[in-house]
Amino acid sequence: MGQTNDFPVRDKRKAGDEDKGVLMDEKVMLGHGSGGSMMKRIIDEVFYEAYGNDELLQGNDAAVLPAPKPGERLAFSTDSFVVTPQFFPGGNIGRLAICGTVNDVATSGARPLYLSCGFILEEGYPMADLKRICSTMAETAREAGVRLVTGDTKVVNRGHGDGVFINTAGVGVVPEGVSLGGEQCKPGDKVPVRGTLGDPGITVMSCREGLSFSADLLSDAAPLNHLIAKVLALGPNTRFLRHPEPRRVATT
């Protein structure tokens, strides 16, 4: 998941420590993004272990994927995630990274198939937290029925990041005959909404600011592609779908 790093490697370790296993101190180091043996180990022991598959394990610079059938179209979307805190009731930044892009692709009427994932890690980030995030991402990808097939990793100096940033991009196939878009909306159309408005945003904010509420708050982040497929199967009356960002329902 990545070949190069623009930052100099300045790990304060003794000669020979690398051969003993770079994950022994359970912290992300600059060398994990250098493109050398340290990067190979974090790829093997964290990323491949969490969501290795045939395409990813080939280790090529790009994943080569099947072309869509005649009449089908590709849907392509990308999103970046910079949530603080990274862990909150109902999920973590890894679940958001999978669900966000899967849902962005699905709302175009597409069947999401493949994802890429790019990590920007801060030096000193706990390896246990990174493994936990990757495990959640793998679990959520299985839930959505998609595969992580390519990725990249970079490490920035301590103090130049917020622990972990994640970018995911997704590709899906739009079946022949499916066409959704805001230009198709008409006056009088009904706008159904899934779930309780505001749950994801207020859950993260309450954790970040130390707020307490009488009700138990949980982020309801979930891959919606299977639900969307059922909605579209009901008939041609669905004109437009949107996956609003947290705290942005009004502007959507």
Protein language model features and the residues they cover:
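Helix-biased detector of long, well-ordered alpha-helical tracts
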Residues: 2-252
